[in-house]
């Protein structure tokens, strides 16, 4: 049966979730698919417009309802604002933000170009801030108080935020560590508004991008020698954690960091 989404004016009867970097082959797409399965009206945003449309079409065909897809460069503060305005225009609400956009280039500190350093911080950390900054005022308007959380923000960080023994990843580690600090402060400021903000820090997650870079032996060695559960993580592992954290079952959880690494690097 084709589901027709009920609307009253410009309000949808479904909770609305905006996911950044949502249309690739990795974590973002897995999160988008899971939230769609959970019943959310998922807004698919990505720098790659074609892939946005393809994922929206895939989900629309599967669930019999339309999914909004919008191109987005999270480093552009004004562009983020335009996307948020469009979401509110289409749905009249925004309940969940998942900040998943990230970028990395491995260079040793002694040789790292200022461009590499800045671009990594722009995408990973500043992009997360840009989205939070535009979304929070709208979430606060709809607050129902701390007893009934009105909205949720999930920031995707990495175990690289504290596992700094990884060589050539200073920019990425710095950006991801910054996300954790931003998460905690934003959570402290906005709990009174009924807004929960948490971070998820994945370990090695198998995806098509990494598969093109590393041989199979790399993943096999990681699973055998580092993972406590004997395997490499999958995008769905992260999506499952996000699914729980945005649900009402996680209503008492905010300002926390959740590690999804197979026990490789538990966060102290």
Annotate each PLM feature.
Residues 132, 175, 183:
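Active-site helix of classical SDR
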Residues 108-109, 116-121, 219, 223:
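Substrate-binding pocket helix/loop in short-chain dehydrogenase/reductase
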Residues 12-43:
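Canonical Rossmann dinucleotide-binding motif of NAD(H)/NADP(H)-dependent dehydrogenases/reductases
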């Amino acid at each position: 049966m084709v589901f027709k989404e009920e609307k009253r004016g410009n309000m949808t009867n479904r909770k609305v979730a905006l996911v950044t970097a949502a249309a690739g082959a990795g974590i973002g797409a897995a999160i988008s698919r899971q939230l769609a399965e959970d019943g959310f009206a998922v807004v698919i945003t990505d720098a790659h417009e074609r892939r946005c449309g393809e994922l929206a079409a895939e989900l629309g065909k599967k669930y019999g309802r339309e999914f909004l897809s919008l191109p987005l460069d999270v480093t552009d503060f004004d562009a983020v604002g335009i996307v948020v305005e469009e979401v509110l225009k289409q749905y009249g609400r925004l309940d969940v933000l998942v900040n998943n956009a990230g970028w990395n280039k491995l260079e040793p500190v002694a040789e790292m170009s200022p461009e590499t350093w800045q671009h990594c911080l722009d995408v990973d950390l500043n992009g997360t801030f840009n989205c939070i900054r535009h979304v929070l005022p709208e979430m606060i308007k709809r607050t129902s108080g701390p007893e009934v959380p009105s909205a949720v923000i999930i920031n995707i960080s990495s175990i690289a935020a504290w596992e700094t023994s990884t060589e050539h990843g200073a920019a990425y580690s710095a950006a991801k560590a910054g996300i954790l600090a931003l998460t905690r402060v934003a959570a402290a400021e906005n709990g009174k508004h009924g807004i929960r903000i948490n971070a998820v820090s994945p370990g090695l997650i198998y995806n098509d991008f990494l598969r093109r870079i590393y041989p199979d032996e790399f993943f096999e060695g990681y699973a055998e020698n580092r993972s406590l559960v004997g395997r490499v993580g999958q995008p769905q592992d992260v999506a499952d954690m996000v699914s729980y954290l945005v649900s009402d079952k996680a209503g008492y959880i905010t300002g926390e960091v959740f590690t999804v690494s197979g026990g490789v690097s538990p966060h102290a």
